Regions:
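Long, K/E/R/D-enriched contiguous segments that form extended
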Residues: 455-462, 466, 480, 487-502
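Well-ordered, non-membrane alpha-helical segments in soluble/globular domains
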Residues: 471-478
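Often metal-dependent polyanion-binding catalytic scaffolds in large enzymes
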Residues: 1-452, 465-470, 489-492
């Protein structure tokens, strides 16, 4: 019943939209089929099933399209209602402070305590934990990002509908907004009208970071920290390792796909970096509005002023409108400088290292950015420990998880491609045998000797096959992006369909 109520509300709003947009007869057809198949599932009847199938077969193309669309939106809204109910149950469980669901941090840590796992053993165990969800481009996910964003808005309104009294101004407003959004869903393309490009797939991955993961990652660490403090208070001072990281195959998984090239891989990494660095910039701006501490009122660690002085050359540009701005608010001054440095970092990365003006003030790596954040957090601990445990700590944990790369890109290509490339390199290099003519043992011996050698034969790349030139370009791109963005920019290099070592 808890699920039927919101589904009934959302379905009612959808029904009004269908009646207005596609006509009462379409709505009646959808309801007839819905009720009929519910009855058929509960009490199978061959005659009823045949009648339902005849109804579907008799629909003209336009009516059939509307019926399919109606069911598609109905199930999308029903899924939202179910997700919202599960969210409510988890929130109620947390609010009561009772036993949480199996697999939660609190439940798992309590099991560790009950089974006499010592704090030292738990520290070692947590230090070994790595949870790395990997995004893949699923060809079955044809929904546009726009559609997913509208569904996300409806989901947010569901929270209001859960808590506001029925027919109250807040409830009525949420109903009206939800009805407008359902109308928008009906009126817009649910799927793309063109073939999905790799760039579309890359941007789809960004959607989940922007609407959910950037906010959820720090909360995961907060939940773990809270559970540890309650169940293992001896570990209150333990620094949580970056156990949560992300991977992606989108833009790296070629596996015989000619549309995924080294340019695609470069684009994927640059888009990832741009997205996460823009988010960091936004968070630094937010922190600048929170850390208003004035040095004329409280004592602030001199290390903050020293860091501001270290960035004085950048400050000439950042504070050109007023060189004295934030002089008595050292945190705000440093955060403004850090935000400028993050923006320079993004420009430098997006230029593939060509923008030397940006390079002067760019962070050399995510660790240098972390160093500034940790400096601020440690200074706050001396006079405002609550702030030190707040948003600044969340950002530190996010940077430890996502770096400047956001998600480590895995590279995948099939073994026959690599065999062809290696054979081509052998064929165009002096003093190397015909790779294709070698047996497995000879191939391994030749490759081992080349890998162990201090250098490689001089190659005339213009004579190489397009596939070999593409592979060399990919390897150079990987090396350059690792240098620019960070060592964790790429994850695994996967050679698929292998059947021998060479």
């Amino acid at each position: 019943e808890l699920l039927r109520t919101p589904i009934r509300l959302l379905a009612g709003l959808l029904g009004k939209v269908i009646e207005r947009q596609a006509g009462a007869e379409t709505l009646q057809t959808i309801e007839y089929l819905r009720q009929g198949f519910i009855e058929e599932r509960n009490n199978p009847d061959p005659e009823r099933r045949a009648a339902l199938m005849r109804t579907i077969a008799a629909l003209d193309n336009d009516r059939l399209k509307h019926v399919i669309r109606g069911f598609s939106l109905y199930f999308a809204l029903a899924n939202l209602a179910e997700e919202d109910l599960l969210r409510q149950k988890r929130a109620d469980l947390r609010a009561r402070g009772g036993e949480l669901w199996e697999g939660s941090f609190r439940h798992t840590l309590q099991q560790c305590r009950d089974n006499d796992l010592s704090p030292e053993q738990l520290t070692e165990l947590i230090g070994q934990l790595r949870f790395i969800p990997v995004f893949t481009a699923h060809p079955t996910e044809a929904r546009r990002r726009t559609t997913m964003s509208v569904l996300q808005e409806i989901y947010r309104h569901c929270a209001t509908l859960d808590h506001a009294p029925e027919n109250s101004p807040a409830w009525n407003h949420a109903v009206a907004e939800t009805a407008d959004l359902i109308d928008l869903l009906w009126s817009s393309d649910e799927v793309r009208s063109r073939k999905t490009l790799v760039y579309d797939e890359i941007n789809n991955g960004l959607h989940y970071f922007n609407v959910s993961l950037f906010q959820a990652i720090p909360q995961v660490y907060r939940n773990l920290r809270s559970a540890l403090n309650d169940i293992y208070p001896e570990l209150e001072k333990m620094v949580l390792p970056p156990l949560l990281r992300f991977g992606s195959w989108i833009g790296g998984d070629r596996d015989g796909n000619p549309f995924v090239t080294h340019q695609t891989t470069e684009q994927a990494v640059l888009v990832h970096a741009d997205n996460v660095l823009r988010y960091y910039s936004k968070q630094l701006k937010h922190l600048r509005k929170r850390l208003l501490h004035c040095s004329s009122i409280i004592a602030i660690d001199p290390a903050i002023d020293a860091r501001n002085e270290h960035y004085a050359r950048l400050g000439v540009t950042v504070f050109d409108y007023n060189p004295e701005d934030y002089n008595n608010e050292p945190y705000r001054r440093l955060l403004a400088l850090m935000r400028a440095k993050i923006q320079h970092t993004n420009r430098y990365i997006q230029s593939m290292g060509e923008d030397q003006a940006a390079a002067e003030h760019a962070y050399p790596n995510a660790e240098a950015f972390l160093d500034d954040l940790i400096l601020i957090r440690n200074a706050l601990k001396q006079h405002d420990p609550e702030q030190a445990r707040g948003d600044i700590q969340d950002l530190i944990r996010l940077v430890r998880s996502c770096g400047f790369h956001m998600a480590s890109l895995d590279i995948r290509q099939e073994s026959t491609w690599h065999t062809s490339v290696v054979a081509d390199l052998f064929a165009h290099a002096p003093n190397l045998p015909d790779y294709n003519a070698l047996d497995e043992a000879s191939r391994q011996q030749a490759l081992t000797q080349l890998i162990a050698a201090p250098g490689a034969p001089l190659l005339f790349e213009q004579n190489l096959s397009p596939e070999t030139q593409e592979q060399l370009a990919l390897m150079r791109t990987i090396a350059r992006l690792r240098e620019l963005v960070g060592a964790r920019t790429f994850g695994s290099y996967i050679i698929s369909m292998t059947n021998r070592t060479s």
